[in-house]
Amino acid sequence: MKRIHKKNKPQIFSTMQAKTTVFLILLMSGLFSSPLFSQQTWSLQDCIDHALTHNIELRLQRFNEEDAAYSLEQSYANFFPTLDANMSHGYSFGRSVDPFTNEFSTERIMRQNARASSSVVLFAGFQNVNYLRYNILRNTAFRFDTEKLQNEIILTIGAAYMQVLYSEDFVETAEQQLEVISQQLERTRALFEGGTLPRGSVLEIEARLAEEELNLITARNNLRMAYIELIQLLDLDPAEEFNIERPVTQVDEEFVILDAESVFEKALNVQPAIMSANSRIMMAEKQIELDRGRRSPVLSLNADLGTGYSQAAMQFAGREGLGPVQIGYLEDNTPVFTDGFNNIMEIKPYRDQIRDNFYQYVGLSLRIPIVNRWEVRTRIQHSKVDLLRARDQYELTRNNLNKAIQQAHADALAAYQKYEATIKSLDAFNESFHYTRQRFDLGMVSSVEFNESQTRLARAEREALQAKYDYIFKVKIMEFYMGEGFRL
């Protein structure tokens, strides 16, 4: 860990005026009169919240997460028994066997059946348990994927937001440089009219003024483009009112740059890309257990009940007398008679059939896989390949994160060193310019020397401004890797 202390808080722009003055200058230029730059202000958090809510790519990713949640619900439901019920009503024609009488019939018969069945798996090689654990891991992996995409969006929005802040400050710098040159032009003209300076000095300052006006136009265009880029990232209508809030973006007097190893160790526990890759390793391991479970016998408990009705089901309804009926002869050929009768049959009542045909069944079933054309073996081999792929993907993600943190650490340290150097350079050029301007007003230096001094100062101010925002952004990236979010 490296701790750096600053004794004095540097000011980037020694000639920077009050914010109210800058606002009035920009208002006069018409910048804030356009629909893009109105009175409505958005903070960085407002922009991030809006992007996370309305980003289409993120919404698509959330569909994957929602789909994984439904699969997880199904995993819990797989432990419940199945319950089915069915009813049928129909007619049979021609020769058929009635299921309730077991007799052949050639007449049209109306039949009805009602049946309910249930089944529950008692053992299947722990497939339901493993499938549940697999979907828990899958749901977790998709959630981390969503967080990873959210992080990418936050970084993109943060970078675009800071680009707008930088562009606004750059416009202020250009405005101030233009104001300095305008004031110097007035003094130069006065000195020329007083005979102290030649006309060439006035022309040199006027040329410098035209150059600064061009710089201001370029700065305003860059600001407009920065706003447009941010608006496009937020999927807003460019015609709507939009302006950002200006947070305090000063460099701290005392700050700490953690070593890259410490940041990396913390990032391993908070970065969703790492946790997603790790979840997929566990998913692949659980998939192998699932596939191996297909080799196990499946023991199920089954229950069934039902009843039915048939028009072919008849019952005895009485007898019909036929009078004396000869049934044979005695030895002496005397005929033998008895009272004849016919049995009267009727269709068995519906309620009685439903009651009498009611049946129940409870039993166990065991299915033992013997030969399945190497299907299970092939599944297991595929799952092992997926496990190796997931492990390599984790290592790749881990290495990429380590490289990114190492690079971010080096960038942050270099950005601070550059910022320190530009501040020192700015202080020196600022003092040199004031000294040159005093000598120029006395006619002791030429307009060429004055313009060169002012050009060096303007360049130093721009470099200091760029170094400031570059350093702040690099530090925010380091904080983001440690799970501290992106805040200004």
List where the protein language model places each region.
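Short segments within alpha-helical structural elements
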Residues: 63, 75-77, 211-236, 419, ...
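Sec/SRP-type N-terminal targeting helices
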Residues: 59-63, 76-77, 108, 122-150, ...
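Terminal intrinsically disordered/low-complexity segments used for targeting and assembly
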Residues: 1-50, 220-265, 311, 315-319, ...
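Transmembrane beta-barrel architecture of outer-membrane proteins
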Residues: 111-115, 159, 204, 211, ...
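Small/polar, glycine/serine/threonine/aspartate-rich low-complexity segments that form flexible
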Residues: 86-120, 247-255, 289, 302-368, ...
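Periplasmic alpha-helical coiled-coil/stalk elements that build and connect Gram-negative outer-membrane
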Residues: 152-266, 411, 415, 435, ...
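Bacterial Sec-pathway N-terminal export signals of envelope proteins
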Residues: 38-88, 94, 238, 244-289, ...
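Membrane-embedded beta-strand positions in outer-membrane beta-barrel channels/transporters
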Residues: 115-117, 161, 264, 363-365, ...
